[in-house]
């Protein structure tokens, strides 16, 4: 899907942490001791990071800032992930956001005020909404436009803008 959308804007709302920025420790934690799942997640991370580094890439990512706060605290799904691993993950996110900017732009909104389902919008060609175990693929031009407009509204209402994102992630304290 990324290849088909080369040269077009990709809009991205991650389900958890941004896939392309996961560290090996976070991948291992998410894989829950399954070597096969760990390898699959690592390949996915590597592929998405490679695509993001290509010069024709234009990716906007928007997510609730609370997702990163919960991660830093080691709460919710992240209970049990060592504080050191979480610190390293946050540092990796900040560094990667800086490295890829401006072709990759991360925006953070207040999840108490707005909601966005996990999804990727590939230009105006297609959209994939993550439903937990699978993706709902959308090809309707009008639905894709509606999703893109909703995504753009999240950017307009962002509390943390792309040029501030790396510094905002760095200020998070792990507990």
Predicted features and spans:
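Hydrophobic protein-protein interaction segments
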Residues: 2-174
